[in-house]
């Protein structure tokens, strides 16, 4: 990277890609094409035209509403599961380790990255969610379903703790596809 200080006095914005860009000494047209696309999106993000950290996500009103709705569902689901099975806190650690800056999209982006969603595509919150659902291993993450339904056991909770990234994918999948959590109504 650039290690010399900026002595010109001109405003400068350093842009660092979230993604590994590959070996610059070995020229490959596909890698160059990918790096150009990622660089374009990184620049647009730095200028405030895109949101997200790892993925280029639209800042239009609909996409922002979808991100807020996803965040609302995800937060409530995560809280409900954590209260019943405290050992599942490791999903929080997986999210922190992903180091995503956009709090509303962070779980979706981290899960999409783990699932192998293409970062060189422009997404809305909805299309990123669809791409994640298409790429994720549904059979594997559905094994965590009893934890969301309240019928899980200690072994399943321990498995969630041992596989925090997979459990994070399961949380995201459930937030995207599952029912809205019922509110507790006291009479």
PLM regions: where:
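Patatin-like phospholipase
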Residues: 1-187
